A protein has these predicted regions:
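Helix-to-loop junctions at the C-terminal end of transmembrane segments
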Residues: 74-88, 171
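C-terminal transmembrane helical hairpin of 12-TM major facilitator-type secondary transporters
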Residues: 89-132
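Juxtamembrane intracellular "pre-TM" segments in multi-pass secondary transporters
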Residues: 1-29
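A membrane-interface helix-boundary motif in multi-pass transporters
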Residues: 169-177
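Short amphipathic helix-loop junctions that connect adjacent transmembrane helices
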Residues: 43-60
Length: 177
């Protein structure tokens, strides 16, 4: 177990720490981009479904409940099945491809039924996060796992600050509202 140091306990210290492991830099960068993209769901889902499909607050609420429930099922059940069948690397690639497909379909669908299909594809793509985190954990020494998880948590926290204004601004720009 390592001693706690204040200079390492911040997002910039996290970046410095993670830069010491070149093998995980691309993985961490992908986690950051995926996290920013995921925050678009939280930030603009209601606006998007109202704008494109004229949904009311009840439909939006139901859709968010479905998103939450399906996400739980994916994380509690599907992740372990896919990890055994595919392994972490292929599961990460599979999940990232599904998420990209889901986002693409969100952007261009004109039909609500396809939106719901895209939502399922997107949610299953959530397996990538677990896979990528597992890969990064396997690269870092055991006595530094806490610092790794803290660093990743710190960076994900930063995306939580950056993404909502970024994504709502993008939505506003492209819809003219």
């Amino acid at each position: 177990r390592r001693t706690f140091e204040w200079k390492r306990a911040n997002p910039f210290g996290s970046l410095k720490y993670l830069s010491e492991f070149p093998l995980i830099n691309t993985l961490v960068l992908s986690m950051i981009f995926v996290s920013i993209a995921n925050h678009s769901m939280e930030s603009v889902w209601a606006y998007f479904t109202i704008e494109k499909f004229k949904w009311n607050t009840s439909l939006i609420g139901y859709s968010l409940a479905v998103i939450g429930l399906l996400s739980i099922v994916v994380q509690l059940w599907l992740v372990s099945i896919l990890a055994k069948k595919l392994g972490d690397r292929r599961m990460a690639i599979f999940g990232l491809m599904l998420m990209m497909t889901g986002f693409f379909l969100f952007a261009f669908t004109e039909w609500q039924w396809l939106l719901l299909g895209a939502l399922l594809i997107y949610i299953i793509g959530g397996v990538q996060g677990t896979a990528i985190q597992s890969i990064t954990s396997s690269i870092i020494p055991d006595n530094e796992q806490g610092e790794l998880q803290g660093s990743l948590g710190s960076l994900m926290g930063l995306t939580t600050l950056i993404a909502p204004p970024l994504m709502t601004s993008c939505f506003s720009y492209f819809t003219g509202k």
